[in-house]
């Protein structure tokens, strides 16, 4: 395939866009990556080999997909824009190990897709150049999906990348930080300049690699744990107590059970959630369960 001009080549990217009368759509957060060094870096960071099954999110016109296909055993790419799906049918024609699925990744049962495309219980690597406006919901879904993944390598807005490893008490510290801490270790792998894209975004970007970890404290139902975490941060400037009342109600018996739960884990009701560690919030979750506030 040495004679194939890379899709990411700026001239070819523009030719493809012109051929199909396409332009980057703001509603899908589209920016086309045209820097081969960055693309090769993403593949290298993910450690893609000929034995790997890869899920890609948001292939666009196929610049990253092409690089993945050259290294992976099989790539399944999810694209929400039907116009891009039509383009991909042509740009990825040389690669018989790629399948493009037109769907919103937030509506996909990944476990089912993986079982169907790769085999029951298959391990996958997930690679994505995510639309910045929807990065957090997609990351949350990937982390909480009941699938086996070796790593997740994601291009995202630098500001979001900074939130992944934010320190307690900082403005960046929140639900996303805590979710990452429970499921994964985050590493900022590549800093990406705006000039790497067509059109250039107004923000800096970064490639982050997530690797799975065993949680320090495993809970019976992570979804319920993070429902409590989310509720605790619902109003960042309010105390944990006020957010708890909003979650569970203001009846006197409920207030007493909330207070008993807080006392049992030595958390002051006046504290804000941004001052609490994952271990503290996990302990609070267990205490709230013992009080019958979480079924």
Curated annotation (Swiss-Prot):
Enzyme class (EC, first level): transferase
Molecular-function GO terms, alphabetical: 16S rRNA (adenine(1518)-N(6)/adenine(1519)-N(6))-dimethyltransferase activity; RNA binding
Purpose: Specifically dimethylates two adjacent adenosines (A1518 and A1519) in the loop of a conserved hairpin near the 3'-end of 16S rRNA in the 30S particle. May play a critical role in biogenesis of 30S subunits.
Gene that specifies this protein: rsmA
Gene3D superfamilies referenced in this protein's UniProt entry, alphabetically: Ribosomal RNA adenine dimethylase-like, domain 2 (1.10.8.100), Vaccinia Virus protein VP39 (3.40.50.150)
Chief location bin: cytoplasm
Binding-site residues, S-adenosyl-L-methionine: 31, 33, 58, 79, 104, 129
InterPro entries according to UniProt: KsgA/Erm, rRNA_Ade_diMease-like_C, rRNA_Ade_Mease_Trfase_CS, rRNA_Ade_methylase_Trfase_N, rRNA_adenine_dimethylase, SAM-dependent_MTases_sf
EC number of this enzyme: 2.1.1.182
SUPFAM superfamilies listed in its UniProt record: S-adenosyl-L-methionine-dependent methyltransferases (SSF53335)
Family according to the record: Belongs to the class I-like SAM-binding methyltransferase superfamily. rRNA adenine N(6)-methyltransferase family. RsmA subfamily.
Keywords associated with the record: Cytoplasm, Methyltransferase, RNA-binding, rRNA processing, S-adenosyl-L-methionine, Transferase
Protein name: Ribosomal RNA small subunit methyltransferase A
Subcellular location(s) per record: Cytoplasm
GO CC annotations, alphabetized: cytosol
Catalytic activity: adenosine(1518)/adenosine(1519) in 16S rRNA + 4 S-adenosyl-L-methionine = N(6)-dimethyladenosine(1518)/N(6)-dimethyladenosine(1519) in 16S rRNA + 4 S-adenosyl-L-homocysteine + 4 H(+)
């Amino acid at each position: 395939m040495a004679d194939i001009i890379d899709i990411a080549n700026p001239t070819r990217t523009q030719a493809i866009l012109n051929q199909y009368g396409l332009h980057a759509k703001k509603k899908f957060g589209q920016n086309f990556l045209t820097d081969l060094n960055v693309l090769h870096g993403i593949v290298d960071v993910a450690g893609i080999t000929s034995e790997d099954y890869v899920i890609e999110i948001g292939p666009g016109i196929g610049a990253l997909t092409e690089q993945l296909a050259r290294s992976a055993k099989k790539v399944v790419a999810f694209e929400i824009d039907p116009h891009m799906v039509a383009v991909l049918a042509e740009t990825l024609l040389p690669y018989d190990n790629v399948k493009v699925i037109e769907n919103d990744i937030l509506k996909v049962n990944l476990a089912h897709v993986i079982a169907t495309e790769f085999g029951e219980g298959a391990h996958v690597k997930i690679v994505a150049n995510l639309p910045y406006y929807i990065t957090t919901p997609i990351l949350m879904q990937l982390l909480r999906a009941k699938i086996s993944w070796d790593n997740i390598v994601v291009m995202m807005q630098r500001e979001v990348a900074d939130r992944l490893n934010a320190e307690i008490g900082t403005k960046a510290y929140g639900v996303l930080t805590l979710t990452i801490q429970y499921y994964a270790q985050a590493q900022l792998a590549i800093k990406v300049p705006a000039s790497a894209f067509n059109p250039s975004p107004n923000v800096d970007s970064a490639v982050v690699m997530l690797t799975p970890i065993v949680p320090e404290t495993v809970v019976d139902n992570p979804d319920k744990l993070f429902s409590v975490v989310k509720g605790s941060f619902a109003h960042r400037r309010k105390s944990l107590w006020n957010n708890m009342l909003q979650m569970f109600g203001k009846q006197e018996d409920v207030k007493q059970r909330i207070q008993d739960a807080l006392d049992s884990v030595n958390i002051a009701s006046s504290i804000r959630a941004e001052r609490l560690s994952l271990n503290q919030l996990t302990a609070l979750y267990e205490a709230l369960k013992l009080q019958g506030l979480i079924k």
